[in-house]
């Protein structure tokens, strides 16, 4: 098992959220390397994050992807792990992981993260990256947690999807949407 977790979020770097998530990972296994993809994703912008992950997944080490852009935190949305030929992708069930999964050959299985032994007890319900996603990512990356112990297997068709909007082409115009602009304007 690869001891690399690639981590992307919309947390920014102005408070301690990224450091706390990395701290949870380190407390589970100090030898896990955390590769930061980006923490500058615009807040709650699932579309931007999904496209960023689609572009990045081809170049980051295989292993575990921990991606958290989660406007539905604190609701009944599921916390999930998706298996692919690339590795395991962990995050909220809001479509964030779909394009990255498709880029590496598609989802094979999905599991709900519900094993209480790997959920950090918490007062509030607003930091699932710390309390749920990071412990499962670290447990799996370290070999301490097997996929079948995550929780129940989910039907792939029941996962929330994010689809790229199509362009509308006529004889006189093309209508589309700019989906992603990097720091250099590309």
Name each region found by the language model:
Residues 4, 16, 28, 34, ...:
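Active-site histidine-anchored catalytic micro-motif
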Residues 1-19:
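A short, flexible N-terminal coil/short beta segment enriched in small residues
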Residues 7, 11, 30, 138:
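Short acidic/glycine-rich loops and adjacent helix/strand connectors
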Residues 25, 29, 57, 61, ...:
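Structural signal for hydrophobic packing residues in well-ordered secondary-structure cores
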Residues 11-15, 72-74, 181-186:
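Short acidic, Gly/Ser-rich segments with clustered Asp/Glu that frequently serve as metal-coordination loops
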Residues 106, 111, 120-186:
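Anionic-ligand-binding alpha/beta catalytic cores of soluble enzymes and soluble regulatory domains
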Residues 17-25, 182:
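Short, solvent-exposed amphipathic alpha-helices that sit
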Residues 50-53:
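N-terminal active-site wall of soluble small-molecule enzyme domains
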């Amino acid at each position: 098992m690869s001891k690399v977790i690639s981590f992307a979020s919309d947390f920014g770097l102005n408070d301690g959220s990224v450091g706390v998530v990395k701290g949870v990972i380190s407390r589970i296994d100090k030898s896990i390397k955390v590769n930061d993809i980006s923490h500058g994703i615009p807040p709650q912008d699932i579309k931007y994050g999904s496209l960023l992950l689609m572009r990045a997944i081809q170049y980051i080490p295989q292993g575990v992807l921990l991606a958290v852009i989660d406007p539905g935190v604190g609701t009944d949305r599921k916390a999930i792990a998706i298996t692919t030929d690339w590795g395991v992708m962990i995050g909220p069930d809001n479509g964030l992981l779909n394009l990255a999964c498709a880029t590496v050959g598609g989802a094979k299985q999905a599991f709900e993260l519900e094993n209480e032994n790997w959920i950090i007890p918490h007062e509030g319900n607003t930091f699932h990256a710390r309390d749920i996603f990071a412990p499962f990512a670290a447990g799996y990356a370290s070999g301490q947690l097997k996929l079948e112990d995550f929780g129940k297997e989910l039907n792939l068709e029941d996962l929330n999807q994010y689809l790229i909007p199509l362009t509308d082409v006529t004889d006189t115009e093309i209508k589309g949407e700019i989906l992603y602009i990097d720091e250099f304007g590309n």
